[in-house]
């Protein structure tokens, strides 16, 4: 909706092209989820019962990272998490992560990729349990490269949706059960 306002003011000439790409997501997202499914299952199986999980996301993936950690992993699966942006990671969280802690990085296709890469590079020196979820890894036929960054949160939603299904299965904890 905001992009439409920008278009109406003459500030977003790519609006019609973006809407066309957005309409292609309906067919493309199941394809992306299928590509990620095996990786998501392996992650959930291996890490369902980890003591704590740190999740790092930035840019337009910060909101989905934060909400996935809090709403799905904590509230619906009773898992301990800490979510942080790549920029804030170096202001505290990076000091408390141990060698055996689980850290997941959620890479999008927008401007903060270099920050994410910097956090990942540092993490390789202090932690042996990193998992990278990168929306750029998945083919999205019908989506122009210039819009992939804009649509990264939707792609991550498909990936985390698959993780959630497997966390529920391996934890034997149905999502609707809360305290």
What are these regions (language model features)?
Residues 1-179:
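A SIS-like phosphosugar-recognition module
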């Amino acid at each position: 909706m905001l992009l439409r306002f920008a278009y109406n003011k003459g500030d977003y000439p790519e609006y019609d092209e973006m809407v066309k790409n957005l309409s292609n997501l309906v067919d493309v997202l199941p394809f992306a989820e299928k590509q990620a499914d095996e990786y998501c299952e392996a992650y959930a199986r291996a890490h369902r019962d980890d003591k704590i999980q740190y999740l790092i996301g930035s840019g337009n993936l910060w909101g989905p990272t934060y909400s996935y950690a809090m709403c799905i992993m904590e509230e619906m699966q009773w898992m301990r998490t800490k979510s942080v942006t790549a920029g804030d990671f170096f202001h505290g969280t990076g000091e408390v992560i141990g060698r055996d802690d689980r850290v997941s990085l959620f890479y999008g296709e927008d401007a903060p990729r270099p920050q994410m890469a910097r956090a990942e590079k540092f993490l390789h020196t202090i932690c042996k349990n990193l998992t990278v979820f990168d929306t750029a890894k998945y083919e999205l036929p019908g989506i122009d490269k210039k819009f992939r960054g804009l649509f990264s949160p939707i792609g991550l939603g498909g990936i985390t949706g698959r993780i959630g299904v497997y966390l529920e299965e391996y934890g034997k904890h149905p999502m609707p059960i809360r305290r």
